[in-house]
Amino acid sequence: MCKKNILSNIKKKKINLLNFNLKKMINFFIKIGEKKFRAIQITDWIYKKQNIKFDQMSNLNFFLKKKLNNIAVIKIPKCIKKIKSIDGTIKWKFLCNKEFIETIYIPEKKRATLCISSQVGCQLKCNFCATGQLGYKRNLLVSEIIGQIWYVINKIKKYNSKKKNFPPIKNIVMMGMGEPLLNLKNIIIAIDIILGNYGFNFSKNKVTLSTSGIVPAINKIAGKIDISLAVSLHASNNTIRNKIMPINKIYNIQLLLESIKNYLKKSSANKGIVTIEYVMLSKINDFQHHAIELSNLLKNIPCKINLIPWNPIKNSSYICSSSKNIINFANFLRKKGFIVIIRKNRGSDIQAACGQLIA
């Protein structure tokens, strides 16, 4: 296709450059008759200088600025609401093409974690999760995934320029709305931008993808994406997992554990350790025999276990395990040699905690 036809096609709908990693950005600039170094300049402006306005990019000439303004845009999701928890957690609500998503900023003393969404809603229907109750609407575009990070980083810098003390984002977790591995194509591109020197330049050890267990996708990314992996297990046997996580009827625990082993063989992120997530549900999965089953399941898998006190959601009959039961569960696993963390409850007063996102 000649350059003229490409430009005429592009004019019909402006292309959002935030959907491109560096490779795709280079291809775009070559197709419109520009040198590939222009792609490096643009990504530098977007991610290093936090500027998305072509007219303010001082190393672009007048004619290139005019061309880009005619055919392209750098567009992030529109933030329509910000809510702050009593514990400092912040929830941002974004408008993405008439749909809503949520992003969570979780500050500690010297660093913060950003929890981002990958889909509008979720099709997995885990019955202890508000997002699962919402149902699935669509996958997020790369620009909508990356835009969450760009927006919050930009906001934190602005807050701190006014002498407000917001710790910088050091960790990215894909634990927001949706199942990342069911939006695999866009997630792969987004991860490239998150890790790339040209992009946000996060360490692979500081980026975590959380999955409910899409076994073929875990096997597919093994050796191709080297970031920390977290797996939402939430049960010690198939009977319980079938009831609370319908995906288990397709990919059961045994298949899931094999895919985890395969991933870890090909990953060096997080020292080759997977994070196992386990929501604590009273009288469902929190008895000692469940802890025994869990320890037997995981004895040959390098892992740390996150025990997650269940956060209340509407239209659910579940009850969170008592603090005593959670501590006893954790101590049993620790005696078996596991690293166990009881996750802190952050942002539950603004429905920003694990399992509460519903936009």
UniProtKB/Swiss-Prot annotation:
It is an enzyme of class 2 (transferase). Its EC number is 2.1.1.192. It is found in: Cytoplasm. Binds 1 [4Fe-4S] cluster. The cluster is coordinated with 3 cysteines and an exchangeable S-adenosyl-L-methionine. Its main location: cytoplasm. S-adenosyl-L-methionine binds at G178, E179, S210, S232, L233, H234, N311. Pfam families: Radical_SAM (PF04055), RlmN_N (PF21016). The active site is at E102, C354. Residues 108-351 form the Radical SAM core domain. One of its GO terms (molecular function) is 4 iron, 4 sulfur cluster binding. GO terms for cellular component: cytoplasm. It comes from the Bacteria. Disulfide bonds join C115-C354. GO terms for biological process: rRNA base methylation; tRNA methylation. It catalyses: adenosine(2503) in 23S rRNA + 2 reduced [2Fe-2S]-[ferredoxin] + 2 S-adenosyl-L-methionine = 2-methyladenosine(2503) in 23S rRNA + 5'-deoxyadenosine + L-methionine + 2 oxidized [2Fe-2S]-[ferredoxin] + S-adenosyl-L-homocysteine; adenosine(37) in tRNA + 2 reduced [2Fe-2S]-[ferredoxin] + 2 S-adenosyl-L-methionine = 2-methyladenosine(37) in tRNA + 5'-deoxyadenosine + L-methionine + 2 oxidized [2Fe-2S]-[ferredoxin] + S-adenosyl-L-homocysteine. Its cofactor is [4Fe-4S] cluster. PANTHER family: 23S RRNA METHYLTRANSFERASE, RADICAL SAM CORE DOMAIN-CONTAINING PROTEIN. Reaction proceeds by a ping-pong mechanism involving intermediate methylation of a conserved cysteine residue. Belongs to the radical SAM superfamily. RlmN family. Specifically methylates position 2 of adenine 2503 in 23S rRNA and position 2 of adenine 37 in tRNAs. m2A2503 modification seems to play a crucial role in the proofreading step occurring at the peptidyl transferase center and thus would serve to optimize ribosomal fidelity. NCBIfam families: rRNA_mod_RlmN. This is Dual-specificity RNA methyltransferase RlmN. The lineage of its organism: Bacteria, Pseudomonadati, Pseudomonadota, Gammaproteobacteria, Enterobacterales.
